From Swiss-Prot:
Extracellular side of membrane: 2-17, 54-58, 59-445
Residues given in the record as Zn(2+) 2 binding sites: H468, H470, C476
Glycosylation site positions: N74, N89, N111, N116, N119, N130, N179, N215, N219, N240, N378, N386, N403, N408
Protein name: Pre-glycoprotein polyprotein GP complex
UniProt keyword terms in alphabetical order: Disulfide bond, Fusion of virus membrane with host endosomal membrane, Fusion of virus membrane with host membrane, Glycoprotein, Host cell membrane, Host endoplasmic reticulum, Host Golgi apparatus, Host membrane, Host-virus interaction, Lipoprotein, Membrane, Metal-binding, Myristate, Transmembrane, Transmembrane helix, Viral attachment to host cell, Viral envelope protein, Viral penetration into host cytoplasm, Virion, Virus endocytosis by host, Virus entry into host cell, Zinc
A GO BP entry: virion attachment to host cell
Protein source organism: Parana mammarenavirus (isolate Rat/Paraguay/12056/1965)
GO CC field: host cell endoplasmic reticulum membrane; host cell Golgi membrane; host cell plasma membrane; membrane; viral envelope; virion membrane
Function: Stable signal peptide (SSP): cleaved and functions as a signal peptide. In addition, it is also retained as the third component of the GP complex. The SSP is required for efficient glycoprotein expression, post-translational maturation cleavage of GP1 and GP2, glycoprotein transport to the cell surface plasma membrane, formation of infectious virus particles, and acid pH-dependent glycoprotein-mediated cell fusion.
Residues in the Cytoplasmic compartment per record: 33, 467-507
GO MF annotation list: metal ion binding
Disulfide bridge partners, by residue number: C86-C247, C292-C305, C314-C323, C377-C398
Transmembrane segments annotated in the record for this chain: 18-32, 34-53, 446-466
């Protein structure tokens, strides 16, 4: 301890010696370089891994500055004027009423009739929305009308409800029964009805789409293809029910129903343009420079912002599910909140807007992937690469779903590695453009040619170009300049034909 105190007391005297300063510099360099080498060798990372393995996961660290993160959207408020939809199992599907209601509509496949046909009247047509006799709840009429319209007009193009009857008793609520075995001159209506319902719901239901060809490969893997609307159930029952969180809500069913004839559409509509993107803080004040999602739009984390570079990619390319979702959020923020319309007008407006905001090709592509039992996008969770230093993000990509659960990060490892590399490239290009804009071209030229001059001078110095002649066996003749014959014009060297040689400067 005394030696340490003595060392600190003698620091001023030590620094005065140049040799001591050199030793201190060498010691610091060795310590720093040794620490860097120790970190690069991997022993520290191994110790950290052994301590935290199986106990903690801070996220997917791609490299020293890039990290794989995700954002999950809450779409319930966006579609608060539309019925919420979900499936409990192969036979029960539910539609919840708009926001602020506690009722719902239950769709059930069964082999047992719920009522005697003598107590029910036939539904002739929906051409004029004539279902008032079937709705005794005075609250679900519009939702029921919208549901039946979508099932029959927009998907099936069927104006007559073959085999459909409803209960008309007062205070009986809603009870509509379809006989799926009844046919018509145009084909089996029940089969088309099940096909359209499965298309809207979008779930892979063996009981709803059961007539398929089972294609098996050589390795034993089998896949159902060319599925048609078919079910072994005889009746489809539509009735009112209370909403008791029967199942988890998914926005895809609502989006599919709002998109008119999406399954048969082969030409994509022209998408509506974006609004002006800007950042809004937690209090709602707008700050130019990017786009922030409000708290209601996220499942977790209070607020999430994306910079202008991400939004610019959406404005340029309309081929990402994330861009579709951002259009819906932006429309909901700037249009729906300013409207004072009743439920029916709001639904019609939102349907028309969704048709111009959502890309047909993306929805069709994901629907086909879901039917083919390969990973697809459900428009709720997106992953992106975050630069922890500059806080820049890559364009979020959809986190694909398979068998009702999200894929593990390792399943799309190549994708986020490519996004990380692209983020690096974008950063380098941006820094280069900024540097070019701040540096005068003349100064850049001077710097370049001075570097060329320095490089040439170093090369010439290494080559060793001779500068004057010497007479062999004698000293340097300077300041005399000897000719190739060994003579000097002043007469000091006057004996001709002596051997001479070229010598570099200083020799």
């Amino acid at each position: 301890m005394g030696q340490l105190v003595t060392l600190f007391q003698s620091i001023p005297e030590i620094i005065e010696e140049a040799v001591n300063i050199a030793l201190i510099a060498v010691a610091i360099m060795c310590i720093v370089k040794g620490t860097v080498n120790l970190w690069k060798c991997g022993i520290v990372q191994l110790c950290i891994f052994l301590l935290l393995a199986g106990k903690r996961c801070d996220g997917f660290q791609i490299d020293r500055r890039h990290k794989l993160e995700s954002v999950e959207f809450n779409l319930t408020r966006m579609f608060n004027n539309l019925p919420m939809s979900c499936s409990k199992n192969n036979t029960h599907h539910y539609y919840k009423g708009p926001e602020g209601t506690n009722w719902g509509i239950e769709l059930t496949l069964t082999n047992e009739s719920v009522a005697n046909y003598s107590n029910m009247s036939a539904i002739r047509s929906l051409a004029y929305g004539n279902i008032t006799n079937c709705d005794k709840t005075n609250e679900a009429g519009h939702t029921l009308k919208w549901l039946l319209n979508e099932l029959h007009f927009n998907v099936l193009h069927v104006t007559r409800h073959i085999g459909a009857r409803c209960l008309t008793t007062d205070s009986a609520g809603i009870l509509i029964q379809y006989n799926l075995t009844v046919g018509d001159y145009g084909g089996e209506v029940g089969r088309h009805l099940i096909a359209s319902l499965a298309q809207i719901i979008g779930d892979d239901k063996a009981a709803w789409v059961g007539k398929c060809f089972n294609n098996c490969s050589a390795n034993g893997t089998c896949r159902l293809t060319n599925c048609e609307g078919y079910t072994h159930y005889n009746y489809l029952i539509i009735q009112n029910t209370t909403w008791e969180n029967h199942c988890s809500y998914s926005p895809m069913s609502t989006i599919r129903m709002a998109l008119n004839k999406v399954a048969y559409s082969s030409v994509s509509r022209k998408l509506l343009g974006f609004f002006t993107w800007d950042i809004s803080d937690s209090s709602g004040r707008h700050v130019p420079g990017g786009y922030c999602l409000e708290q209601w739009a996220l499942v977790w984390a209070g607020i999430k912002c994306f910079d202008n570079s991400v939004m610019a990619k959406c404005n340029k390319d309309h081929n990402e599910e994330f861009c579709d979702t951002m259009r819906l959020f932006d429309f909901n923020q700037n249009a729906i909140k300013t409207l004072q319309l009743n439920t029916e007008n709001s639904i019609n407006l939102l349907k028309r807007s969704i048709n111009g905001l959502i890309s047909d090709s993306l929805v069709i592509r994901n629907s086909l992937k879901q039917l083919a039992r390969i990973p697809y996008c459900n428009y709720t969770k997106f992953w992106y690469v975050n630069d922890t230093i500059t806080k820049r993000h890559s364009l979020p990509q959809c986190w694909l779903t398979y068998n009702g659960s999200y894929l593990n990060e390792t399943h799309f490892r190549n994708d986020w590695l490519l996004e990380s590399q692209q983020l690096y490239n974008d950063m380098l290009v941006k820094e280069y453009e900024e540097r070019q804009g701040k540096t005068p071209i003349a100064l850049t030229d001077i710097c370049f040619w001075s570097l060329v001059y320095f490089t040439v001078s170093v090369f010439l110095q290494l080559v060793g170009i001779p500068s004057h002649r010497h007479i062999v066996g004698q000293g340097c003749p300077k300041p005399h300049r000897i000719s190739r014959n060994g003579l000097c014009s002043c007469g000091y060297y006057n004996i001709p034909m002596k051997p001479v040689r070229w010598v570099r400067k200083g020799k």
